[in-house]
């Protein structure tokens, strides 16, 4: 009896990890590269001023530092509804009008993976 239960638990581990994060980090990375990288950079640290065209000096948060301090719900709200939804800058646009809830959760999962890979 113990062995079949153990096998079943091992088979369910990947789906439990996905459910815990609420999204797929691999898909989230693709979306991030397409929609977020211009402002937040390829690793979430903000603009690489040496490689960008001249832009106004708009502060962009270092996501590797900010994400661990925020809940998934908070991050979903910022991405879906924009910075003003949580009393941040109006310069963070809302993406909820053209991203599914699954896409939003995938991006949050990717942001969480950035935090883990930075350690």
List the predicted regions and their residue ranges.
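Periplasmic/extracellular electron-transfer cofactor-ligation site
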Residues: 22-23, 29-59, 80-90, 114-119
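Boundary at the C-terminal end of the N-terminal hydrophobic targeting segment
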Residues: 17-21
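Bacterial N-terminal signal peptides
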Residues: 4-15
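Extracytoplasmic electron-transfer domains, predominantly the class I c-type cytochrome c fold
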Residues: 54-113
């Amino acid at each position: 009896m113990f062995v079949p239960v153990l096998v079943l638990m091992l088979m369910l581990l990947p789906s439990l990890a996905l459910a815990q994060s609420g999204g797929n980090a691999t898909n989230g990375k693709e979306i991030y590269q397409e929609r977020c990288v211009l402002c937040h950079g390829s690793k979430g640290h903000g603009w690489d001023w040496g490689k960008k065209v001249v832009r106004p000096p708009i502060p962009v948060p270092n996501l590797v530092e900010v994400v661990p301090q925020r809940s998934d719900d908070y991050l979903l709200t910022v991405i879906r509804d924009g910075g003003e939804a949580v009393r941040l800058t109006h310069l963070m646009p809302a993406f909820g009008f053209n991203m599914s809830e699954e896409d939003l959760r995938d991006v949050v999962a990717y942001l969480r993976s950035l935090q883990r890979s930075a350690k």
